Amino acid sequence: MDSKRAMVLRMEGTNNEEEAFLSLKRAGFEPEYVHINDLARKRKFIDDYNLMFIPGGFSAGDYIRAGAIFAARLRPFLSDINKFIDSGRFIIGVCNGFQVLTELGLFFNGDRKIALTVNESNRFECRFTYIRLSTKKVLSGLGNRPFQVPVAHLEGRVYCDNKTLDELIENDQIIFRYVDNNGNYSGYPWNPNGSIMNIAGITNDSGNVIGMMPHPERVYYPYQMSGNERNSDKGTGEIFFRILYNST
């Protein structure tokens, strides 16, 4: 594959596919919408792509729990997905996509060691906050500065036991943490869901499976951002997706 082909995977209830598609395209990828039925009917194949992007939304209405049904629909392709990961190619799951990756256990070689549970506020949280890179594994071009990002979720609180948290820290798998506008770790509302250690996103041990609750695809341009951030030279999304492109 000479070009970097990106699959934007969708099913009933996903959203933000268009924002994801356009962000990937503007960053240099060659994106393509792929419905879960395209895989099931062998019209399209995971191995034909360099990157898989699982967008946000409410897949299958979030029945049972967020991301559970989408993950069940993907489980027949788990062998192909693991080969995709082992080859060094990237999977990105944003919001509902993060929930899907969690259900599949892709951060811990098939083990479901974390949960994304209901926000501490017990309500849907939809607004801007900030995140900061917290790993040296991947996306190092983001540096140490805070980035404004929108969040929109009810079940985004990262929860795990102490042993798993120690593993995440030891293996440098916490990729993003919520911060305030000065880059300091802070509680609600900057941490919109009460995630342990302000975790906004994690990776697998290799750094090529990334799950995050915030939506960089919604702020590709500065005018999509809030307050003084609208005066930035580039939107958070452009910075994120261009660095992602260079990492793949």
UniProtKB/Swiss-Prot annotation:
Its EC number is 6.3.5.3, 3.5.1.2. It catalyses: N(2)-formyl-N(1)-(5-phospho-beta-D-ribosyl)glycinamide + L-glutamine + ATP + H2O = 2-formamido-N(1)-(5-O-phospho-beta-D-ribosyl)acetamidine + L-glutamate + ADP + phosphate + H(+); L-glutamine + H2O = L-glutamate + NH4(+). PROSITE patterns: GATASE_TYPE_1 (PS51273). GO terms for molecular function: ATP binding; glutaminase activity; phosphoribosylformylglycinamidine synthase activity. Residues 6-248 form the Glutamine amidotransferase type-1 domain. Its main location: cytoplasm. Pfam families: GATase_5. It is found in: Cytoplasm. SMART domains: GATase_5. Keywords: ATP-binding, Cytoplasm, Glutamine amidotransferase, Hydrolase, Ligase, Nucleotide-binding, Purine biosynthesis. InterPro entries: Class_I_gatase-like, PRibForGlyAmidine_synth_PurQ. The active site is at 95 (nucleophile), 215, 217. GO terms for cellular component: cytoplasm. It comes from the Archaea. One of its GO terms (biological process) is 'de novo' IMP biosynthetic process. Pathway: Purine metabolism; IMP biosynthesis via de novo pathway; 5-amino-1-(5-phospho-D-ribosyl)imidazole from N(2)-formyl-N(1)-(5-phospho-D-ribosyl)glycinamide: step 1/2. The keyword Nucleotide-binding applies. Part of the FGAM synthase complex composed of 1 PurL, 1 PurQ and 2 PurS subunits. Part of the phosphoribosylformylglycinamidine synthase complex involved in the purines biosynthetic pathway. Catalyzes the ATP-dependent conversion of formylglycinamide ribonucleotide (FGAR) and glutamine to yield formylglycinamidine ribonucleotide (FGAM) and glutamate. The FGAM synthase complex is composed of three subunits. PurQ produces an ammonia molecule by converting glutamine to glutamate. PurL transfers the ammonia molecule to FGAR to form FGAM in an ATP-dependent manner. This is Phosphoribosylformylglycinamidine synthase subunit PurQ. The gene is purQ.
